[in-house]
Amino acid sequence: KNMITGAAQMDGAILVVSAADGPMPQTREHILLAKRVGVPNIVVFLNKQDMVDDDELLELVELEVRELLTEYGFDGDSIPIVAGSALQAVDAMIAKGTTKQSENEWVDKIHKLMAEVDAFIPTPERIIDKPFLMAIEDVFSITGRGTVATGRIERGKVKVGEIEIVGIRDNRQSIVTGVEMFRKLLDEGMAGDNVGVLLRGIQREDLERGMVLAKSRSITPHTKFESEVYVLKK
């Protein structure tokens, strides 16, 4: 459930597969879910390379991953695959306190992975010229400040001012008193940003996942609609 919630907002993903063990049952499940919720691009990291002495085994695991990606509708032949060891890279950075390139082969592999992410996963165009809309992912309270709804802005912009809470219960008006991202106060949040929206006069129990925040009177909730449902079996 948590994987679906997060994946539904992704512009791309890094699929981590153990080079020592190869694709596991959950690997197949994660690829399927990524495809179903519309993750457009994937880059693969073959972790634990330090535990694999046989280059042919590493090539076999890479081939398995490519075939699996192709099976579920991704372009398995062109997806970048980088092998490395996250643990070795972290140990090297802790020991030397550096993340510079060309100083450690394992750290270099992480740099290579992120370079592939930058090259292969484009930044999509954000819809900022339409009315604000954000699905609520989580809700929490800040003592002395009020209730915060978090989520990824689907479209438009949000800043201090009037807002409407839509879904599940009757529509309700509120006032945005602050917008934060990574504990920094913003003048405004825009499409694509993961933000926390501080709401005036709203209790934590008034909000839940499935509701949306929107520009006042810009959307209408419906109780009848057509949808496509994917059911996963164990």
Curated annotation (Swiss-Prot):
PROSITE patterns: G_TR_2 (PS51722). It is found in: Cytoplasm. CDD domains: EFTU_II (cd03697). Transmembrane segments: none annotated. Residues 1-125 form the tr-type G domain. It catalyses: GTP + H2O = GDP + phosphate + H(+). One of its GO terms (molecular function) is GTPase activity. Its EC number is 3.6.5.3. Gene3D superfamilies: P-loop containing nucleotide triphosphate hydrolases (3.40.50.300), Translation factors (2.40.30.10). GTP binds at residues 47-50. Keywords: Cytoplasm, Elongation factor, GTP-binding, Hydrolase, Nucleotide-binding, Protein biosynthesis. It comes from the Bacteria. The keyword Aminoacyl-tRNA synthetase does not apply. GO terms for cellular component: cytosol. GTP hydrolase that promotes the GTP-dependent binding of aminoacyl-tRNA to the A-site of ribosomes during protein biosynthesis. Belongs to the TRAFAC class translation factor GTPase superfamily. Classic translation factor GTPase family. EF-Tu/EF-1A subfamily. Monomer. This is Elongation factor Tu. It comes from Prochlorothrix hollandica.
